[in-house]
Amino acid sequence: MKKQRNLRSMAAQAIEQVVEQGQSLSNILPPLQQKVSDKDKALLQELCFGVLRTLSQSDWLINKLMARPMTGKQRTVHYLIMVGLYQLLYTRIPPHAALAETVEGAVAIKRPQLKGLINGVLRQFQRQQDELLAEFNASDARYLHPSWLLKRLQKAYPEQWQSIVEANNQRPPMWLRVNRTHHSRDSWLALLDEAGMKGFPHADYPDAVQLETPAPVHALPGFEEGWVTVQDASAQGCMTWLAPQNGEHILDLCAAPGGKTTHILEVAPEAQVLAVDIDEQRLSRVYDNLKRLGMKATVKQGDGRYPSQWCGEQQFDRILLDAPCSATGVIRRHPDIKWLRRDRDIPELAQLQSEILDAIWSHLKSGGTLVYATCSVLPEENSLQIKAFLQRTADAELCETGTPEQPGKQNLPGAEEGDGFFYAKLIKK
């Protein structure tokens, strides 16, 4: 039996690591969840995701409720108060229980002398809640985004930025990809129905299913046998543009964690696929996905800017470049992105993307297809990136996939329930 731990203090420490140390929640949370019971795993995730989704609100409230911010070794208490505020505002946890557990969290982080302070701040919020929230809802902090990102979204999407922000602040739906080598989508949906769950097919992407209610993967029919994979609908759209064929040599660049690698092999089981990623640790997830689905691909660690180091002079029929990006299209899935990214990251990422595009283009066969994809909504990484590439690359031709005013297709967050995503399909003359 696992030792009873204070979930509020664990959440506060995790959030502190994200905000103060720039660590990714997807790296921090799983090891913490291993330390708690199954029933507590979901609550720990809810507290971490929820506070990060609404961070600017709790920051704003604490500044109103406290004369001085908590600093130094007491900084964790700041995040513990955030966890308390989130419970009072957004969960069905009874207020007395939320307060008691949060105050007790001070003992777990070895700050028992601050229990009275935490209790006082949270009770003061309860007394002034209506007045404080009215003031908050009239401020820019209500958008729950950092100001630099808000400015970029307003500039790029003067008519749509508010709906993008709203979508980013929602909980995401759970999308699945049915493995067509095992079942048709309709036959798997029938199995899902037999298991007492409901799913809905995507109108455009033939393997995509949205669950009515998110569920643990082990509850999904045939998950362990590789019948289905968790993957957002927008990410599945890459295969529509790539259109892999049996017998082709296909490169999946920046491939981890392997969702698109395995999708290529579901669509074209006899394709020769090379999956490459710069992050050796994340490549372990590519191997795991291939193993679960019973598929084979060549997997290599490598930097996309220097392809000759990992593929020599090899030429490919098709290349999928899921480029490193700001991930501003998947904030609803990874709310820590709002606080991990900085404005200065965008030009640096755009430069890296252009270097990878230029380097990999020489490894595409004449007549071959390259699909450039990102999970960003920022034009500098997407339409402007492709415009610049077309201007400097004489043998590159764009396949029309989107609206006339931009090369490529930009999906915005929440459109057809999918993530924000960009695709451009290029043919080598």
Curated annotation (Swiss-Prot):
Main location: cytoplasm
InterPro entries referenced in this protein's UniProt entry, alphabetically: MeTrfase_RsmB-F_NOP2_cat, MeTrfase_RsmB-F_NOP2_dom, NusB-like_sf, NusB_RsmB_TIM44, RCMT, rRNA_ssu_MeTfrase_B, rRNA_ssu_MeTfrase_B_ent, RsmB-like_ferredoxin
Keywords: Cytoplasm, Methyltransferase, RNA-binding, rRNA processing, S-adenosyl-L-methionine, Transferase
CDD domains: AdoMet_MTases, Methyltransferase_Sun
Pfam families: Methyltr_RsmB-F, NusB, RsmF-B_ferredox
Binding site for S-adenosyl-L-methionine: C254, A255, A256, P257, G258, G259, K260, D277, D303, D322
BP GO terms, sorted: regulation of DNA-templated transcription; rRNA base methylation
An example Gene Ontology CC term for this record: cytosol
GO function terms (MF aspect): RNA binding; rRNA (cytosine-C5-)-methyltransferase activity
Highest taxon listed in the record's lineage: Bacteria
Active site: C375
EC number: 2.1.1.176
Matches recorded under PANTHER family: NOL1_NOP2_SUN FAMILY PROTEIN _ ANTITERMINATION NUSB DOMAIN-CONTAINING PROTEIN, NOP2 YEAST -RELATED NOL1/NOP2/FMU SUN DOMAIN-CONTAINING
HAMAP family: 16SrRNA_methyltr_B
Family: Belongs to the class I-like SAM-binding methyltransferase superfamily. RsmB/NOP family.
Protein name: Ribosomal RNA small subunit methyltransferase B
Organism: Escherichia coli O6:H1 (strain CFT073 / ATCC 700928 / UPEC)
